[in-house]
């Protein structure tokens, strides 16, 4: 840990040393509480998709650090708030999902957390709670009388999630306007039912978190704290968790462990040390050694990052297979059964498929236009040979050992397999 840390609790000292802290309410009071017995803290996740992607990983790791420091994490699933939709950072209303879709998404998301947290009934075991349990029980008039009285419209209009939409003259529904009240009530309910004293989240959630802290302190006169992490972007300014080919999902059903490994292997040089601190359990002295690597040696640090991140999300065996497949593909030029595959109807391949379309469909390019630009830059390969014509037809004649090997640049590979 950093000797200059202003914190005394293991939890906050760890967060500070690894770069998780952006803002904290009542910092000294929280630090004192974290030095005592286990504290209970939560982060909320709305169920807008059947999995979570890397953009949510810093929050998942925050819960992991909490548990590692001897405290109790609550994963709050937004079965109720997802019905409304968080307007934070959005230029338009989210699509409203059916109850069945929300529950299906929650089921998919649950599998992600079991890889990072230990669940159970013990004092520091994680639990998962759905806010639909209490939000769905409120009558409209009851909700307004109990909680609406504690919020002024003047203040609600001042929050960025509202103010920015209005300044851009983009509509915000009354449904969305209520989201911040619902999130504040979540904290109060968790405090009452589970003794939860801390809500954590990204810095874009600061206003919503403050509402919950203040509501809990005002209504029940109980201790309540908030903590946010920095919004994460790569050194080049790209949004964390997205690539040209789409979201970097945390479950194997939507993104293969191989592609997940490759995502971390492709980390920009300037981000390696920061990501090792945030997304792995490696000790800080080992991370310092890896950060000190220069030139081509930095690639070894990237492989360690990829190994550690993939091991955490997919297990030891899948991480090993992903690295072995990468080494075979890039260092030995061989085919590997562990490389991602894209299945295509044999009849379609017999008739011929436009290469640019195949690249887009296989997830190697975000669009046909991007595939054409790759070809023009020499970054599009078919069976290890550069292909300048992205409009040429790929047919059964291109099969080698039963597959067509497509590559975008040096690191993204898919085997096209007829079925």
Curated annotation (Swiss-Prot):
A motif ('KMSKS' region) lies at residues 239-243. Belongs to the class-I aminoacyl-tRNA synthetase family. TyrS type 1 subfamily. GO terms for molecular function: ATP binding; RNA binding; tyrosine-tRNA ligase activity. GO terms for cellular component: cytosol. InterPro entries: aa-tRNA-synth_Ic, Rossmann-like_a/b/a_fold, S4_RNA-bd_sf, Tyr-tRNA-ligase, Tyr-tRNA-ligase_bac-type, Tyr-tRNA-ligase_bac_1. GO terms for biological process: tyrosyl-tRNA aminoacylation. Its main location: cytoplasm. This is Tyrosine--tRNA ligase. It catalyses: tRNA(Tyr) + L-tyrosine + ATP = L-tyrosyl-tRNA(Tyr) + AMP + diphosphate + H(+). Residues 353-418 form the S4 RNA-binding domain.
């Amino acid at each position: 840990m950093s000797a200059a840390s202003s914190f005394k609790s293991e939890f906050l000292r760890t967060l500070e040393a690894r770069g998780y802290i952006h803002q904290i309410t009542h910092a000294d009071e929280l630090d004192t509480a974290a030095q005592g017995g286990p504290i209970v803290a939560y982060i909320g996740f709305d169920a807008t998709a059947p999995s979570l992607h890397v953009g949510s990983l810093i929050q998942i790791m925050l819960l992991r650090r909490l548990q590692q420091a001897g405290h109790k994490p609550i994963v709050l699933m937004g079965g109720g708030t997802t019905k409304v939709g968080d307007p934070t950072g959005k230029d338009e209303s989210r699509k409203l999902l059916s109850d069945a879709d929300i529950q299906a998404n929650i089921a998919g998301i649950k599998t992600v957390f079991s890889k990072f947290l230990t669940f159970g009934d013990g004092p520091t075991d994680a639990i998962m709670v759905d806010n639909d349990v209490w939000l769905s029980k409120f009558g409209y008039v009851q909700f307004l009388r109990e909680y609406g009285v504690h919020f002024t419209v003047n203040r609600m209009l001042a929050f960025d999630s509202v103010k920015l939409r209005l300044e851009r003259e983009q509509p915000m529904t009354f449904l969305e306007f209520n989201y911040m009240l619902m999130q504040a009530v979540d904290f109060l309910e968790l405090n009452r039912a589970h003794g939860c004293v801390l809500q954590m989240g990204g810095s874009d959630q600061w206003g919503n978190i403050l509402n919950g802290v203040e509501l809990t302190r005002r209504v029940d006169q109980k201790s309540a704290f908030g903590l946010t992490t920095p919004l994460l972007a790569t050194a080049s300014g790209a949004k964390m968790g997205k690539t040209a080919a789409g979201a970097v999902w945390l479950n194997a059903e939507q993104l293969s462990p191989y592609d997940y490994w490759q995502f971390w292997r492709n980390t920009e040089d300037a981000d390696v040390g920061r990501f090792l601190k945030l997304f792995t359990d490696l000790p800080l002295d080992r991370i310092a050694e890896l950060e000190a690597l220069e030139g081509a040696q930095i690639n070894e640090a990237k492989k360690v990052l990829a190994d550690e991140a993939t091991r955490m999300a997919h297990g030891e065996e899948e991480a090993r297979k992903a690295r072995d497949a990468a080494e075979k593909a890039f260092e030995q030029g061989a085919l590997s059964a562990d490389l991602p595959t894209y299945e295509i109807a044999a009849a379609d391949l017999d008739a011929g498929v436009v290469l640019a379309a195949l690249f887009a469909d296989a997830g190697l390019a975000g669009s046909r236009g991007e595939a054409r630009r790759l070809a023009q830059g020499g970054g599009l390969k078919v069976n290890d040979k550069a292909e300048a014509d992205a409009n040429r037809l790929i047919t059964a004649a291109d099969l080698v050992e039963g597959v067509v090997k497509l590559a975008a640049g040096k690191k993204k590979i898919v085997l096209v397999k007829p079925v």
